[in-house]
């Protein structure tokens, strides 16, 4: 059996389930841990998945994390609170709870990029990468 890697694994590892209107659950895997502590960006991705389902605006515009204590591999509960909802942006907070203790507090603004109007301006040239076969494999 080959080890699952890449985007499909990330989608699986960041999946959440809705328990109640504003409460979601997930499972932190040790695949995204360093020294027993779960990576903060991985934790933030789980919060973003829950927020995208919870809010009317589905695309993250800004997410901030306040890391209160170390999150560890295992079950997690996410308690979401909508702070405001406008035509183009929703704001919310997430309490990231393990074993009854709040580990992380996220605040976020979400939007809907499909409804954006106007031109998109790219001021930088796209990055150039070597062919995939020349990249380092882990």
Per-region residue spans from a language model:
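Terminal targeting signals and extreme-terminal segments of soluble enzymes
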Residues: 1-138
